[in-house]
Curated annotation (Swiss-Prot):
Ribonucleoprotein as UniProt keyword: yes
Protein family according to the UniProt entry: Belongs to the bacterial ribosomal protein bL34 family.
Pfam family, one: Ribosomal_L34
Keyword Zinc-finger: no
Name of the molecule in the record: Large ribosomal subunit protein bL34
UniProtKB keywords: Ribonucleoprotein, Ribosomal protein
GO biological process, one term: translation
Gene (name only): rpmH
InterPro entries in UniProt: Ribosomal_bL34 (IPR000271), Ribosomal_bL34_CS (IPR020939)
GO molecular function: structural constituent of ribosome
Entry GO terms, CC: ribonucleoprotein complex; ribosome
Amino acid sequence: MKRTYQPSVVRRKRTHGFLVRMRTKGGRAVIAARRAKGRTRLAV
């Protein structure tokens, strides 16, 4: 059986990247929450 996780930088950035997060209200909330928590990495 094929493993489910087949890493791809392109797909990773397109689905979880910073610009994608900034596009929606919910995504911006995620970034804001991570900033408030003091995360070094806000998005992938």
